[in-house]
Amino acid sequence: MDKIKPNVNNYFFKAYQQFGFPITIVRPSQTYGYDRIPLSVKGKSCWSVVERILNDQPVIVHGDGKSTWHCTHTFDFADNFIQLINNEKTIGQAYHNINPRFVTWDMIYHELYRLLNKQPHIVHIPSDLLAMSQKYDHTTAFLGDKQYSCCYDMSKIKRDIDHFDHHISIEKGLAMYLKYMDAHPELKIKDDEYNEWCNHLIDIYHQVEKTVKDNL
C-alpha cells in the first residue's frame, strides 16, 4: 500500500493541474478511537493485548520499543479535517493532520500498564523475526512501517487552517478506550489462537536468547 500511495497522489495532483479537479490530500498517520488503540503486536483486536496484561501474561513489542510514533485520535483528526473542507487555501495541496507529539512504543505500553494497575512485562522481539511469522502478516506492519521512527512537520496545516489543535493525548486516549470497552463488554472478545501463538513465540525466543548467551 505504501508503494501505491505516491502514484495515487501524483494522479490526483495531475488531475488538479490539468483539469482543475479540486483535490486536497490529508495524511493522518495512525488514527485511533473508542474501540481501537495504537499497539505493536496484536491479534484480531486490541483487546487481545489488554487481556494478556490483565492476566499477567507478557506482551510482545517489536524491536527495542524505542522507535517513535505519532498517535492521532479520531476526534482531533476530524476537528482539523473539517477546516480543510471548502477552504480555498487547501485546494491542490497535501497536509499532515497528525498529533505533533511523538511517543515511543514502550511509552504507549507503559501507560497502558499504568492505567490497568499492572507491572510492565514486555518481551521485545526484532521486527525481522516477527516478519517471519506464517500465521500473521507482520511484514507490512513492521518492516514497512512501525520499525521506523517517525517525526512529522505540522507547520503547513497550522498555516492554512484557523484552529489546529490536538488536545487528546495518548494518555487520555488510552483511558477513553478502556472506559468505552468497560461500557461495551460485548467487544471484549477472547482470542485464544493469538494467546497460544504469543506464548509459543515467547518460549522459542527465550530459548534462542539462552542459547546465544550460553555460547558467546
Residue ranges: model-predicted function:
Residues Q83-F142, M154, M176, L187, ...:
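Mid/C-terminal beta-alpha module of Rossmann-like enzyme folds, strongest
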Residues M1-I25, S29, Y34, L54:
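Active-site Tyr-X1-5-Lys
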Residues T74, M132-F164, A183-E186:
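Conserved C-terminal active-site "lid" loop/helix of NAD(P)H-dependent oxidoreductases
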Residues M1-F13, S40-W47, H70-C71, F102, ...:
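Short-chain dehydrogenase/reductase
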Residues F19, G33-S48, L84-Y95, K118-Q119:
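Glycine/proline-rich active-site loop of Rossmann-fold NAD(P)-dependent oxidoreductases
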Residues G33, V61-S67, Y95-F102, E111-Y113, ...:
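Glycine-rich Rossmann NAD(P)(H)-binding loop
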Residues S48-T72:
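A conserved pocket-lining segment of Rossmann-fold NAD(P)-dependent short-chain dehydrogenase/reductase
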Residues H70-F77, S169:
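A conserved structural motif in NAD(P)-dependent oxidoreductases
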